[in-house]
Amino acid sequence: MTDYTTYLGFRHLEKLYTASSLSFDCETTGLKPQVGGLRLLQFASAARKIVVVVDLFAASEEELAQLDLFFTNGDRFWLAHNAVFDLGWLQAYGWHPRGEVRCTMLASKILTNGMPNLKHGLAPVAKRYLGIDVSKEEQRSDWSGELTEAQIRYAAKDVEIL
């Protein structure tokens, strides 16, 4: 897998503004919007080998408005793992990606329909189809505090794999 360049901050969304296809992921402080917060949004372009990570806890109102324009600009192809989870969070914040959304978790379930004892989280799917080992150790870390380098690397890698 080719290494992507990772950028942190809203100003870097412009690097992806015209991309026709993007992977996206969310890092949250809870499993549901009613009991947690949306901490990070990560976007990746395979064509451009770029990942952009934005920290919503540090966002201004202007930057949040920028996200609405970003999600509705053009007619993109969006790819996520467990898209139902991610889209639920986006919709809770009033963001509705324009275009087609595809889910690698659902694709894995369809491809392995009827095969017992298979898991469909990102780590087992990446191992099964890409031969890549993915550490999910940071997934359970505290996303409500100051972000660590390890958390940012984890968030970027999750969306890069897609």
Which residues does each PLM region occupy?
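N-terminal accessory regions of nucleic-acid-interacting proteins
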Residues: 1-26, 34, 60-63
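Active-site-proximal helix-loop-helix substrate-binding element of RNase H-like nuclease domains
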Residues: 32, 36, 42-161
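Conserved Rossmann-like nucleotide-cofactor binding loop
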Residues: 29
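N-terminal G-site helix/loop of the GST-like fold
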Residues: 18-20, 39-42
